[in-house]
C-alpha cells in the first residue's frame, strides 16, 4: 500500500528548512540540496523532492499539491511497440518548503533491471478544480521519455551490481584520482552503429570483439572498425525532443480519482542526439534501450572497462542549450531567452546551476572516464552593466571540478570542450583560437576540439590543405591538448551539404559517393593525424565504415519540410542509383511514389528553391509543386500534409540508410586493416601526443608543382624516430625516394617501413616509388 510516512516526511521537511535558512551563499545552499532532488530510495522508502517555483508564482496553496503515484495493474512490457495499461492512482500530500515540494512515502515499488517500478509525477489543483502536472527533470528512469511520468528506480542497487569493479580498484588513489586523456577516440552514434541500434546491441558487439581479441582470433573487417581504440565517445544519450505534432508516448484516459488507462508507445524517435530538452539529462534516452532499463548504459561502460586492453568511456553532454520543447517540461526559471538552437539556459540562477551540475554528476556516475562538452561557447549570460553576453567560464570550470564516485573510487574525469568562440561571429574561422577553455582552466590536461576538427572542414575541396597551412602550424606547435582528425559527426554532415558545383578533388573517386567516402576515410589524412600530429586523434565510425550520415531528426512538424530541403543536396553525395534501388533502401519514399532515385532527385531540386522564394509558405510550395510540368512523382494530391509526410519519410529512410551494419558488405579489408594497424601504431607511441620539439620537422615539399606532399619527422624520448610522407592532393609525384628528401635528421641508415597505404604493395621495403593522391608511408628507426 502506498502511503505517506509522516515521521520521515517531517524529517525531510526539517532538513530542507534548515538548509535553506542557513548562512551559506545561495548557490552553495542549492548544491547541498541538488543531490537529493528527484526520487530516491532511502531505507525502503521513497524520498521525493521537486523544485517548484511555479507553484509559488501562481500562489497555489500547499494543500493542493500532491505526488501522484501510478502503479500499473499489469506489468508493462517495455519491449512492445504499443500497449494499453491500467494504472491505480494514489494521491500523496506533499509539504511546501519555500520553492520546494517534498514528501517521504512507503510502498512505492522501486524499478530494477527485472522489475517495473511505480510511476510518479507532481499534481496540483487550481481554483477551478482542474489538475495540472509537473514532471521530474531529475528522474533516474524515463521509459516513455522526458514528457511522461518518471519511474521510481533503485539506482543505487543498479550501480552496486556493476561488473567492472577491478577496473576502478586499479585506478583508486588515496585522494581524488584525476583521469587523463586517452590515446585515441572512436565517436559512435548508438542508433546507427549496429543493426539493433541500442546500447544493448552495442554492448554485445564489444563483448564479442573482446572474446576474439583475447583469443588472438583474426578480426573481420566489420570488427576491425571498432578495434584499436583507447576510448569510445558516444554521441549524446540523453532524452531528446518528441514528435512535435504527436502522438505522445504516454496518452491517458482518466477514469476518476482512483485509476487511469494509458496508451503506451515505445519511444521511436530518430535523432542525432543534440536536440535535448535538459529534463532527464541524468538518465538515458529510452529510444536507445532495448530493454527499456537504464542499466544498459552501465553494461556498456563495463564492457569497455573489461576489454582485454581496457577502453575508456567518454560521454558527450549538451548543457549549452535546450530545444524549444524544453519549455513544455521545465518551468520558466530554467531559461534565459531564445537562441539559434532554441533556448539559452539560466546559468546565473543558483538552483538551475546546481541542478544542471547535479544532472552531469549523475550521468557520469554510470562509469564514464571522460566528458565531452558540446558547444561550450554557448554557455553565456547577460551582463546588464555592459549590455552584452558573457561566456560563463566559471560554469565550465565547475563542470571539470565535479568529483565522481564509482565503485568506491573518487575521481575527476578527463574533459574536452567543443569551443569555437567567437563562433558564430562572422569572422570566427579567422578569429577562433580553439584555446579559450584550455588557457582558462586549472587542469593541464583539459582539451578542446582543434581547428581541423571543428564543424566547417571539407578536405575534398581542391586547395584545402595548403589553405589550412596556418592552422596546421598551430596544431604542430599547440595541438597537444587538441582533438585532431577531420571526420566527426559535424564535419561529415557539412561535407554532405557542399555545393556540387564547387571544385572538388576528383582524384579521390569516380563518383560523388566515392569522393565523399574517401575524403573522410582517407589513408593520407589518417597518416598525418596518427603518425605526425600531436593531440588525441578521433574517428567517427560512420566515416570509417564509409557509411552515410546527415542531420537526423524526425520530430519536426512546423519546420520538418525546411530541414529536409536543406538536407536534400546530400542525396547527390550519398545515394547513387544502385544504392537507392536496393529493396531495403528508402522503402517509405518508394511507397509514396518515388520509385527510383531520379524521381526523388527531381523533386528535391524544386523543393529547396521554393522554400527560399516563398519564404517557407507550405501552402504555396504545395501548390507550385503540384503545377510542375511534366508532373513530379510522389503522392497525389500534393498537400501540406503530404509534404510533411515526405519530410518524415526522408528522415526515417535516411536514418536506416545511415546504419553502419548496412555497409559491412562494402568494407575494404585492406583499408580497415590499415586503419587498425595505424591506430595500434599510435597506441604503442603515446608520446606522439606531445607538441613538436626542436628536432622535429613537418613541412610540405617545395615547389608544390601540382602536388601537396606532407612530410613529418618525430623523435621519441627513447630515441626512436618516426618519419611520415603523405600525398594529400594533386597529381602523381613522379618517382622519388622518401628517405632521400632534404630533411634534417633523416640522414643515415636503419630506416624500416612500418606502415604503407593499401595501394603500396606489401613487398615494398624501401627505395624509390611514385605516390598518387591519398598514398603514404611511415618509416621508423631505432637508435643503434
Report the location of each language-model feature:
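Aromatic- and acidic-residue-enriched carbohydrate-binding clefts of CAZyme catalytic domains
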Residues: 244-295, 302, 323-351, 358-359, ...
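Catalytic domains of carbohydrate-active enzymes, especially glycoside hydrolases
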Residues: 205-241, 254-274, 365-366, 370, ...
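Short, solvent-exposed loop/turn and secondary-structure capping segments
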Residues: 133-136, 197-200, 243-247, 324-328, ...
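Hydrophobic faces of well-ordered beta-strands that scaffold small-molecule active sites
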Residues: 184-188, 232-234, 313-317, 371-373, ...
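Conserved alpha/beta catalytic core and glycan-binding cleft of carbohydrate-active enzymes
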Residues: 407-591, 599
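Carbohydrate-interacting/catalytic domains
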Residues: 1-186, 199-214, 230, 516-527, ...
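Active-site neighborhood of glycoside hydrolase catalytic domains
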Residues: 305, 322-433, 491
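The substrate-binding groove and active-site-proximal loops of carbohydrate-active enzymes
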Residues: 189-203, 275-294, 338-354, 376-393, ...
Amino acid at each position: 500500500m502506498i502511503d505517506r510516512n509522516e515521521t520521515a516526511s517531517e524529517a525531510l521537511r526539517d532538513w530542507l528548512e534548515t538548509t535553506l535558512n542557513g548562512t551559506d551563499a545561495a548557490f552553495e545552499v542549492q548544491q547541498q540540496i541538488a543531490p537529493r532532488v528527484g526520487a530516491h530510495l532511502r531505507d525502503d522508502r521513497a524520498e521525493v523532492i521537486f523544485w517548484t517555483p511555479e507553484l509559488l508564482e501562481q500562489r497555489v496553496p500547499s494543500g493542493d499539491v500532491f505526488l501522484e503515484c501510478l502503479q500499473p495493474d499489469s506489468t508493462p512490457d517495455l519491449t512492445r511497440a504499443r500497449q494499453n495499461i491500467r494504472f491505480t492512482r494514489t494521491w500523496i500530500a506533499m509539504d511546501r518548503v519555500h520553492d520546494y515540494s517534498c514528501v517521504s512515502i512507503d510502498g512505492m515499488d522501486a524499478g530494477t533491471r527485472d522489475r517495473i517500478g511505480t510511476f510518479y509525477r507532481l499534481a496540483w489543483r487550481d481554483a477551478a478544480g482542474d489538475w495540472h502536472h509537473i514532471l521530474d527533470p531529475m528522474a533516474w528512469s524515463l521509459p516513455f521519455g522526458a514528457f511522461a511520468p518518471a519511474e521510481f528506480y533503485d539506482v543505487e542497487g543498479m550501480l552496486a551490481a556493476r561488473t567492472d569493479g577491478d577496473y576502478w580498484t586499479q585506478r583508486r588513489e588515496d585522494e581524488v584520482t584525476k583521469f587523463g586523456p586517452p590515446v585515441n577516440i572512436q565517436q559512435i552514434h548508438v542508433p546507427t552503429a549496429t543493426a539493433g541500434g541500442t546500447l544493448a546491441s552495442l554492448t554485445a558487439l564489444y563483448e564479442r570483439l573482446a572474446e576474439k581479441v583475447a583469443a588472438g582470433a583474426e578480426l573481420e573487417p566489420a570488427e576491425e572498425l571498432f578495434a584499436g581504440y583507447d576510448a569510445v565517445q558516444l554521441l549524446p544519450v540523453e532524452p531528446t525532443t518528441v514528435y512535435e505534432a504527436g502522438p505522445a508516448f504516454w496518452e491517458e484516459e482518466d477514469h476518476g480519482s482512483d485509476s487511469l488507462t494509458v496508451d503506451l508507445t515505445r519511444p521511436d524517435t530518430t535523432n542525432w542526439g543534440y536536440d535535448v530538452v535538459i529534463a532527464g539529462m541524468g538518465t538515458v534516452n529510452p529510444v536507445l534501450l532495448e530493454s527499456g532499463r537504464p542499466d544498459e548504459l552501465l553494461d556498456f561502460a563495463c564492457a569497455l572497462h573489461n576489454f582485454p586492453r581496457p577502453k575508456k568511456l567518454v560521454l558527450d553532454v549538451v548543457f549549452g542549450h535546450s530545444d524549444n520543447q524544453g519549455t513544455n517540461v521545465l518551468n520558466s526559471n530554467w531559461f534565459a531567452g531564445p537562441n539559434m538552437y532554441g533556448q539559452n539556459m539560466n546559468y546565473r540562477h543558483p538552483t538551475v546551476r546546481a541542478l544542471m551540475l547535479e544532472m552531469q554528476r549523475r550521468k557520469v556516475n554510470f562509469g564514464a572516464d571522460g566528458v565531452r562538452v558540446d558547444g561550450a561557447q554557448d554557455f553565456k549570460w547577460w551582463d546588464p552593466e555592459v549590455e552584452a553576453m558573457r561566456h560563463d567560464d566559471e560554469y565550465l570550470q565547475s563542470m571539470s571540478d565535479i568529483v565522481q564516485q564509482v565503485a568506491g573510487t573518487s575521481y575527476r574525469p578527463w574533459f574536452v570542450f567543443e569551443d569555437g568562440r567567437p563562433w558564430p561571429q562572422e569572422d570566427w574561422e579567422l578569429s577562433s583560437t580553439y584555446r579559450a577553455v584550455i588557457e582558462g582552466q586549472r587542469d593541464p590536461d583539459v582539451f578542446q576540439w582543434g581547428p581541423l576538427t571543428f564543424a566547417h572542414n571539407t578536405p575534398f575541396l581542391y586547395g584545402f590543405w595548403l589553405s589550412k597551412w596556418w592552422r596546421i602550424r598551430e596544431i604542430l606547435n599547440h595541438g597537444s591538448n587538441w582533438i585532431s582528425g577531420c571526420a566527426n559527426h559535424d564535419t561529415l554532415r557539412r561535407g554532405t551539404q557542399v555545393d556540387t558545383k564547387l571544385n572538388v578533388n576528383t582524384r579521390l573517386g569516380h563518383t560523388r559517393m566515392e569522393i565523399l567516402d574517401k575524403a573522410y576515410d582517407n589513408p593520407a589524412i589518417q597518416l598525418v593525424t596518427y603518425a605526425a600530429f600531436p593531440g588525441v586523434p578521433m574517428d567517427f565510425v560512420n566515416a570509417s565504415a564509409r557509411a552515410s550520415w546527415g542531420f537526423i531528426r524526425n520530430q519536426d512538424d512546423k519546420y520538418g519540410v525546411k530541414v529536409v530541403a536543406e538536407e536534400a543536396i546530400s542525396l547527390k553525395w550519398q545515394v547513387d542509383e544502385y544504392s537507392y534501388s536496393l529493396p531495403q533502401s528508402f522503402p517509405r519514399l518508394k511507397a509514396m511514389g518515388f520509385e527510383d532515385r531520379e524521381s526523388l532527385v527531381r523533386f528535391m531540386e524544386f523543393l529547396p528553391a521554393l522554400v527560399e522564394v516563398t519564404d517557407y509558405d507550405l501552402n504555396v510550395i504545395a501548390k507550385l509543386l503540384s503545377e510542375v510540368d511534366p508532373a513530379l512523382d510522389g503522392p497525389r494530391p500534393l498537400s501540406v500534409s503530404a509534404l510533411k509526410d515526405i519530410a518524415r519519410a526522408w528522415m526515417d529512410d535516411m536514418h536506416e540508410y545511415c546504419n553502419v551494419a548496412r555497409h559491412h558488405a562494402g568494407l575494404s579489408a585492406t583499408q580497415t586493416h590499415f586503419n587498425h594497424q595505424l591506430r595500434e601504431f599510435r597506441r604503442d607511441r603515446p608520446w606522439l601526443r606531445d607538441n613538436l620539439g626542436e628536432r622535429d620537422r613537418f613541412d610540405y615539399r617545395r615547389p608544390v608543382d601540382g602536388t601537396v606532399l606532407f612530410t613529418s619527422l618525430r623523435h621519441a624520448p627513447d630515441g626512436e624516430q618516426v618519419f611520415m610522407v603523405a600525398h594529400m592532393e594533386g597529381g602523381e609525384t613522379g618517382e622519388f625516394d622518401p628517405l632521400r628528401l632534404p630533411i634534417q635528421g633523416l640522414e643515415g641508415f636503419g630506416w624500416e617501413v612500418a606502415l604503407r597505404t593499401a595501394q603500396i604493395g606489401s613487398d615494398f621495403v624501401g627505395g624509390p616509388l611514385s605516390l598518387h593522391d591519398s598514398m603514404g608511408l611511415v618509416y621508423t628507426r631505432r637508435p643503434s
